[in-house]
Structures are given as C-alpha cells and as structure tokens.
UniProtKB/Swiss-Prot annotation:
Protein name: Cytochrome P450 736A117
Chain residues that bind heme: 460
Principal cellular location given in the protein's record: membrane
Enzyme Commission number: 1.14.-.-
Entry annotated with the keyword Ion transport: no
Enzyme class: oxidoreductase
Single GO cellular component term: membrane
Cofactor(s) listed: heme
Classification of source organism: Eukaryota, Viridiplantae, Streptophyta, Embryophyta, Tracheophyta
Length: 518
C-alpha cells in the first residue's frame, strides 16, 4: 500500500516545479487526517446524545420548523425517534414525543427539568418573570406557586366561584337564544364567555364589550395582542447576534407598547381595589386581586410578594385561563359538529339526566355525565391547547434513556403527538370519546398518555378551574339547542386549519346555527 507521505516526498525531490503542489497536497492530507481523527475521537461522545437531523451553520435546525412546529417536529421525530436533539441557532433543544420519554422527563427527572428557558417575550410581558408560569425554578417560584395553589386555585376556591360560571353560562345561553336560527360565531362567544369568567374571578367585574365601556373595549384588544405575542418567536433568543431584528421588524416596539398598556390597565384596577380595601364580606366572595392584596399586607404570611408579583400573577390568570380554555371549547364543538353520532349520543346523555328543564344546568348535574367527560378528554387528546406545552430547561447534565443531555438544554414535550400515538390509541386520528369510558385515564398529569396540561412540578395549577368552565358550558349548549352548520354544509366541510403560536385554536371562526330544543 502506498504511503501518502512517501509519495509526496518523491514528488518533492523529483522536480522543483512540483514542490508547491507537494506542500499543498500535504497540507490537505494533514487537514483531512486531523478531521478524521477528531471525528473518531468524539464518536463515543456523540453516540450518547439523542439522534439529530443534519443542521446548518448558524441557524441549526430552525429551517426545518415550519408554520406549525408541532407538525414539523412530528415528521422529524418519526425519522429520528421519541427523544430527538435539535439546535435552534446555538440553543440545544430536546424534543420529547412519546409517553415513555415524557415520563422520564416529567417524573423520573422532574427536578432536573423544572426550569424555564429565558424568553424576551415573557421577560417583557410578564414583569421580568414575576409570574408563575415563566418564573425560573427556585424559591420565588415555589412561593408564588404556593399562593396560587392554596389561595387562588384550591378546590374550595374553585367551588366558591361556581355562581360566576353558572351566571356567565346562562348569559351565553340567552345570547344564543336571541340569535337562534341565525348564523352564530361560536368562537367569538366562547372567547367572551371565558374572558368574562376570568375577569369576574380575577378582577371582580367584567370588561367585555358593552360591560366595561371604552376600558372594556381597549382591554379586549390588549388581551388579544398579549395572547398573540406570547406565541411569537424572537429569533434573537436563539441566534443572539440577530437580536437587532426585533428593532427592525417592530417586535420590540410592539412588546413595549402592549406591556405598558397592560401595566397601566392593571395599575388602574389595583388602585380601584385598594380604594375599596375596607369592604367586608365573605372570604369566598373575594376576587383573586382582593386575595393577593391581602396576602401582600400580611407580613406574617411567610410569603412576601410585592406589587409587581401581584400583577404578574394576575396576568398569568388571563394567559392560562382565557385562550387555552376557549380553545378547548371551540375544538370540542367543532368535533361534535363533524361527528353527528357523537353529538346525538352526548345530547341523549345530558337530556336523559337533566330532562326538559329550561333553566341552566348546574355543576351538580355534571357528576353523572360520563360521556361528557369522555368527549372532553378526547378533545384534549386531539387538540391540546398548547401542543408543545410550555418549554422546560435542564439545570444540570443528566442521562435520559441512555442519552446524555447537557445542562441548559431546552425541552419541548409534544402533548399533541403523544395524543396521536398509534402505540397508545387505536385509530388515533379518529374522534372516538368511547375510548375514555371506563379506562381511568385522566388529564391531571398522572397518566402520560394524556398530558394536555403537563405533569410534574410544572403542571398547570388551574386544571380544575379550566375544566369546570368547559364542562358546564358544553353541557348547556348541547342540552338547550340542536345544531347545524350554515348553508346545510356537512361536517366534512369544516375547515380544521389551526392558528400558529403558543396555543392552537381554529384559524377560521367556528360558525353554526342553533335551533332551540325546548
């Protein structure tokens, strides 16, 4: 076998003309030799990392993420596996797309993956991470989460707001009756319902159109922009030297504007509450802001929070309680309209339990509505409000399923793909609520086949609050009305296109015609 070095030496000695060529070839050979040696040296290290698709310089795998990230990641993970390592710019990103892998992250190694990645969007809109959802894992997060779990979203507190949910559902039913036989924008109605419930529970009054005057109209617009921005990606978070783009594309200016408008609005509401702080009454009738201001005054509470923390927590209630809740309602009704068999079965259950009562169905009536709960679970399986959940981040190096995961790796858990896994569900793309009858699977974070609200330390603390709104609203609208699509369209004609962003609701509003049943 020829020795390349000997060949080069012979060429060098044979002719002075060939000397430059010899040195060039030698240099190329040495570079190739070093590259080969380096790659073989690190083969063992690389083999212990999760599988990765090829990436580009600077942007990494960002070019492979389309308009619908959860769908793009599904296609990639089908080729590379349920634990897949990507790079968004310079940031390592672990994509988790199976129930088994999610269990490893959210249960076995939950503490390691309990942090949140930094985000320019969250930093500016949520008071520099002073809320619960985006706060870094640590003592502050433990304190404010404890406030939410024990004081705002406990079972007793959620029950205490039952009258608010029933009253606002009754108002929605009246509005539907007033427009019966006409085309209704159900998406808009669900947005208003959830906004009104959250406003009354969190702030003590409604701020919807016609209720809060000019301030109500402005708040509705600001809240819409707030939700849109939470689902926006700032490229500078992944490619730092492109941070200047937010000043060119207007994102930075829009963030500053919306953050200031929200802050001004909440400051006004806080001042109104403080001016009436002497008001007495049953503790169960106090709104969230009343409770937070009272905790702020209690120096003996052991959980000191300042005014900024109060505002951050209140904003969390809107971020988690409006867009995600109305999205679940919207998709449930969409699937019912697409599947008349399921709609009829649900109506038969509800009407069989409640009868011909014309007043609003109450939460006491929901206890025996097992098919209603199955419809809700099936909706969340196919349409989790946040398909990739809120990202997590590893705090240290850790081994997961034999792979080495480095500290500061972002983690995206695809609740959307897990819910469509054919290994877990028969005919996963079909809407069949019967699969959840008598099988015990729930959405509260213990069953990793269904985790629309996450699991572990960072599980959404408002699950019970959100589902209480969903169930009473859905039960009432299928009980009181028969439904049809406009222009005698069939269920197959419904456009199922999703929006892009943090939550995935329908891109086009859901419109239907209601016919009073009684």
């Amino acid at each position: 076998m020829l020795n390349p070095l000997q060949v080069l030496q012979e060429l060098n000695e044979s002719s002075s003309f060939l000397q430059p060529l010899a040195f060039t070839l030698l240099a190329i050979f040495l570079v190739l030799l070093y590259t080969w040696y380096s790659s073989t040296k690190t083969t063992t290290q690389k083999s212990t990392q999760p599988p990765s698709p090829p990436k580009l310089p600077i942007i990494g795998n960002l070019h492979q993420i389309g308009s619908y990230p959860h769908r793009s990641l599904q296609a990639l993970s089908q080729r590379h596996g349920p634990l897949m390592l990507l790079h968004f710019g310079s940031v390592p990103v672990l994509v988790v797309s199976s129930a088994e892998a999610a269990r490893e992250i959210l249960k076995t190694h939950d503490l390691t993956f309990s942090d949140r990645p930094k985000s320019t969007i969250f930093e500016k809109l949520l008071y520099n991470y002073k809320d619960v959802a985006s706060a870094p894992y640590g003592e502050y997060w433990r304190q404010v989460r404890s406030i939410c779990v024990l004081n705002l979203l406990s079972n007793r507190r959620v029950r205490s707001f039952r009258s608010v949910r029933e009253e606002e559902t009754k108002s929605m039913i009246r509005n539907i009756k007033g427009s019966s036989s006409s085309v209704l924008n159900l998406s808009e109605m669900f947005v208003r319902l959830t906004n009104d419930v959250v406003c009354k529970v969190a702030l003590g009054r409604k701020y919807s159109d016609g209720e809060g005057g000019e301030s109500g109209r402005m708040f509705k617009e600001i809240l819409g922009e707030f939700g849109d921005l939470l689902g926006t990606v700032n490229i500078g978070d992944y490619v730092p030297w492109l941070s200047w783009l937010s000043h060119v594309n207007g994102l930075g200016a829009k963030l500053d504007k919306v953050a200031k408008q929200l802050d001004d609005f909440i400051d006004t509401v806080v001042q109104e509450h403080m001016n009436h702080s002497s008001r007495s009454g049953d503790d169960d009738q106090k709104d969230f802001l009343d409770i937070l201001l009272a905790i702020q005054k209690e120096t003996s509470a052991g959980i000191p929070i300042d005014g900024v923390s109060v505002k951050g927590i209140i904003l969390d209630m809107f971020a988690a309680g409006t867009d995600t809740t109305y999205s679940a309602l919207e998709w449930a009704m969409t699937e019912l309209l697409r599947h008349p068999r399921v709609m009829n079965k649900l109506q038969n259950e509800v009407r069989g339990i409640v009868g011909n009562r014309t007043d609003v169905i109450t939460e006491d009536d929901l206890v025996e509505m097992h098919y209603l709960k199955a419809v809700t679970k099936e909706t969340l399986r196919l349409h989790p409000p946040i398909p990739l959940l809120v990202p997590r981040m590893s705090t240290r190096d850790v081994e997961v399923n034999g792979y080495n995961i480095k500290a500061n790796t972002q983690v995206f858990i695809s609740a959307w793909q897990i819910g469509r896994d054919p290994k877990l569900y028969d005919k996963p793309e079909e809407f069949e609520p019967e699969r959840f009858l008598n099988n015990g699977i729930d959405y509260k974070g213990n069953d990793f086949e269904l985790i629309p609200f996450g699991a572990g330390r960072r599980v959404c603390p408002g699950i019970q609050f959100a589902m209480a709104v969903n169930e009473i609203a859905l039960a009432n609208i299928v009980h009181k009305f028969d439904w049809a699509l406009p222009d005698e369209a069939s269920g197959e004609d419904l456009d199922m296109t999703e929006t892009t962003g943090l939550t995935a609701h329908k891109k086009y509003p859901l419109k239907a015609v209601a016919f009073p049943h009684f």
